[in-house]
Amino acid sequence: MTPAKFERSLSKSKPPAGLMPALAALWWAGKDDWDKAHKLVMDEGGADCAWVHAYLHRVEGDLDNAGYWYRRARRKPAQGDLQAEWTAIAATLLAANAP
């Protein structure tokens, strides 16, 4: 799936089938459903989920907690626009998980 198609899927009521937890959480974040997104990543152990988890805490303004999750994801804390970060995470995760 391309990042553009992933973003267009936000017009639907459910995420595309078969998304890994990090992408499903990012999808719900794109729908402004922070709680659903957070539930999908809060108990996952991988770096991809940690990256989305960091993004979610950045969205809520909890930069200390976001910093913890960026470190767990082995990523530098984002500084710019939240939408730009959402797009960058989506593009990276989609590329890494392409068939």
Identify the residue ranges that each predicted region occupies.
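Inward-facing hydrophobic residues that define packing positions of alpha-helical scaffold repeats
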Residues: 7, 22, 34, 41-42, ...
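Generic helix N-cap/helix-start motif at coil->alpha-helix transitions
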Residues: 15-21, 45-50
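Residue-level signature for tetratricopeptide repeat
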Residues: 26-27, 55-57, 93
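Helix-turn-helix repeat elements of alpha-solenoid scaffolds
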Residues: 26-34
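TPR/TPR-like (Sel1-like) alpha-helical repeat modules
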Residues: 45-47, 59-80
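Terminal, low-structured helical/coil segments at or just beyond the last alpha-helical repeat
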Residues: 82-99
